[in-house]
């Protein structure tokens, strides 16, 4: 079965993106990688060069990033906007997506303003005080995401309504896994099983990759280093 149903919403378990060379397929993956990096580690320095540089005025324009996700059988939309050339956050938001096409605001943030909690988020007085303190601290912070700050050494119970910040953050941290052609294999255990290796070879043959066989050979480190480019060998060693 290629579909999964969550709250009467049918979702594909997998999808494939097709397109001509240089049509933007890789950029889709890079955008997701960029969002994950911003949430987990902060805005990278190289973001300054990521805007569309074919026009000079683009340096001052906003770029908008948003994902719709499923976590704990609930649907969320999370996103942020920034002026890439300045590494400056201009907006940030999170909504719970409800049945019937409605959306309930979790929080919104505009440049120079503290984040605002959604009116329908019913939290305790203690949690509301916590949120307000955290939000006020972000008023003039244009280089960090509020989602990141809400997951940095904050004492938020899993039973609190504010735990939604932890759930969305956890999706970026643990559920969004990105592999690129240069990602090294770190676990070869699957290949040491004869049945698994046979399955791998059968799949590779059906993909028409030009690879005829995958097998396990015992080689010395010297043999491996002599057969591979230095950078690939170092990836394997590390």
Mark where each language-model region is.
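Short solvent-exposed loop/turn micro-motifs enriched in small/polar/acidic residues
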Residues: 2, 59-62, 100
